[in-house]
Amino acid sequence: MYESGLKVPLIIYFPPKWRHLAKVSSGKEYGLINFTDLAPTVLSLAGVRPPKHMQGNAIYGKFVNKGKREMQFALASNQLHHFMPVRAVTDGRFKYIRSYIPYRQFALRNYYQWGMPSNQVWDELILKGGGNPEWGQPFQSHPAEMLFDLEKDPDELHDLSGVSEYEGVLCKMRQALSAHIRVTTDLGFFLPDSRIGHILYEKVRQERYPLAELYALVEMVGTATIDLLPVLEEAITSSLPEMRFWGVVGYAKLAKEKRIRTCPQALLALIYDTNPYIASEAAYAISYLGRYQKGITRLLTPTLEKNRKIGYSSLECLSLDPEMREYIRPFIPELKEAAETLPHVENEDAGFMARGILVNLGEMDIKELYGAEAYEKGLKLNHTRRAMLPLPN
């Protein structure tokens, strides 16, 4: 959710035949533009008024929108098997990033990106204790809220969310994002498997799902204090899986921060929840409450094989925490067996995740992460690619 991945130049070229449609001379524009603006712009250039239900603003043509966008929003939900919703908003000067599961590190791997040598070298450097604090930020838990001054800090390294001078800006950005989530009926806080068998957009409307309560809970758990415990106790006993999951997230945050030390029976029972996301998150939480063996065993042994990668995601999260590695080490033989016997060729294979956890524990060199078969397949794929056609003329 950083500018290095979001801020992409938009280059618009009008061939001579159509240059009259631009109605502006060549130059640069520094306004806030996003993908939703493309369709209205094409219609506007064709002389068609964009329908009212269409998102985005026409930036050229007969129906150009002359008003400037004040806020730009961004979202992310999944990093392959890592469910970790993040939202962001910027006004061009300040950037606000909201992480709803802040203990999930941004460096949790996806295995197409980690095929790049630069990512592997970065991992190796940080896991061996090298680099500076800024380089190590993605490998650590992070604040639920982060605020950056893009003019003074374009690389987004210095979080201002705790600086009293910027409290007004922080509040403004927080409110803007909170309102946007509700106006757009953001469904990104539902568990990935909740989309199976139906259209979630229709389901929440037909069943009158309590979205207001869900949004309120989601926003509270990332900044949870012990004062929220009564809310969390109620949430983890809800009949709605989303409420149970986000209640567990609140417990996990408090447990990791050592604000609670006793494991509630209701939380312990959730490691056997029928929903694998809830079970894995509960196993993660109890691992920070002294139930290391029970929690880690649950993450390594899914009820169904198809859910293995969900548990491995939480285990990878644990393995990036130096304090937790000693509790994972007794399970190294099982991880090594999984690394060898489970598939580790395709991007989403569980064997890659087992190997990645071993790398985090210092039990495998990161150069061994992929193995010869995956490496050869990657070479073959990239050697057969051709240049993009057609080119502009």
Feature map (PLM): residue ranges:
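C-terminal, low-complexity/hydrophilic appendages and adjacent surface loops
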Residues: Y2-E3, L80-G162, G168
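A structural signal for well-ordered alpha-helical scaffolds and beta->alpha junctions
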Residues: S4, F35-A39, K52, G56, ...
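A generic secondary-structure signal for well-formed alpha-helical elements
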Residues: P15, V42-P50, F63-G67, R98, ...
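WW-domain-binding short linear motifs
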Residues: E70-L75
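Long, internal low-complexity/basic segments
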Residues: G130-A144, K152, L160-N393
